[in-house]
Amino acid sequence: MKILIVSDTHRRDGNLREIIEKQSPFDMLIHLGDTEGSEAYFKEWVNNDNCVIRVVRGNNDFFSQTDREKEISIGKYRAFLTHGHMYGVSFELETIKEEARARKADIVMFGHTHKPHLEYCEDGLVVLNPGSLSYPRQDGRK
């Protein structure tokens, strides 16, 4: 299964469309918030009726009707999806990890910080932030 995981595109649709074109085909698109309205076009851009699309609302998605959080299955794994701002991810990750564990998730995915992060915890929890396609904040900004 091939999954495209993105976050914090902030209506810079060209960036997202470019990565969709480069990575297609894939089986699932996960967007971890701050689409700022672009989610209405995801199905059209992916152009694959078999692709599952999962989106959660970020702190800048003021008018979005999407859920703030989702729990989904990815094969045999249980994933907790959230934007992360409600868990203080800009300051520390322990709170979001505790929430993921309380939900019995194998993977927690979040955005908000605009910095990619991948961590494998001793108890097996995987912590993933894809960063931002539009406004990256990590060194090198790519």
Can you annotate each of these PLM segments?
Residues 51-52, 89-142:
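Conserved beta-sheet core of the metallophosphoesterase superfamily
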Residues 5-7, 28-34, 54-59, 80-83, ...:
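Active-site neighborhood of phospho(di)ester-bond hydrolases with catalytic His/Asp-centered motifs
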Residues 54-99, 103:
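Helix-adjacent hinge/juxtasegments
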Residues 1-50, 61-68, 140-142:
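N-terminal active-site segment of His-dependent metallophosphoesterases
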Residues 24-25, 41, 71-73, 104-106, ...:
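A general secondary-structure boundary signal
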Residues 11, 37, 86, 115, ...:
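Short active-site segment of divalent metal-dependent hydrolases/proteases
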Residues 12, 41, 78-80, 87, ...:
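A generic structural micro-environment signature
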Residues 1-3, 71-80, 121-127:
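Beta-strand-turn-beta hairpins that frame and shape the catalytic cleft
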